[in-house]
């Protein structure tokens, strides 16, 4: 994933 949270 590009981010540690849902982008």
Swiss-Prot record:
<dbReference type="GO" id="GO:0099106">
    <property type="term" value="F:ion channel regulator activity"/>
</dbReference>
<dbReference type="GO" id="GO:0090729">
    <property type="term" value="F:toxin activity"/>
</dbReference>
<comment type="function">
    <text>Its target is unknown, but this toxin may modulate voltage-activated calcium channels (Cav) or calcium-dependent potassium channels (KCa).</text>
</comment>
<keyword id="KW-0872">Ion channel impairing toxin</keyword>
<keyword id="KW-0964">Secreted</keyword>
<feature type="modified residue" description="4-hydroxyproline; partial">
    <location>
        <position position="6"/>
    </location>
</feature>
<protein>
    <recommendedName>
        <fullName>Contryphan Zo747/Zo763</fullName>
    </recommendedName>
</protein>
<keyword id="KW-0379">Hydroxylation</keyword>
<keyword id="KW-1015">Disulfide bond</keyword>
<keyword id="KW-0800">Toxin</keyword>
<feature type="disulfide bond">
    <location>
        <begin position="3"/>
        <end position="7"/>
    </location>
</feature>
<dbReference type="GO" id="GO:0005576">
    <property type="term" value="C:extracellular region"/>
</dbReference>
<feature type="modified residue" description="Cysteine amide">
    <location>
        <position position="7"/>
    </location>
</feature>
<comment type="similarity">
    <text>Belongs to the O2 superfamily. Contryphan family.</text>
</comment>
<keyword id="KW-0027">Amidation</keyword>
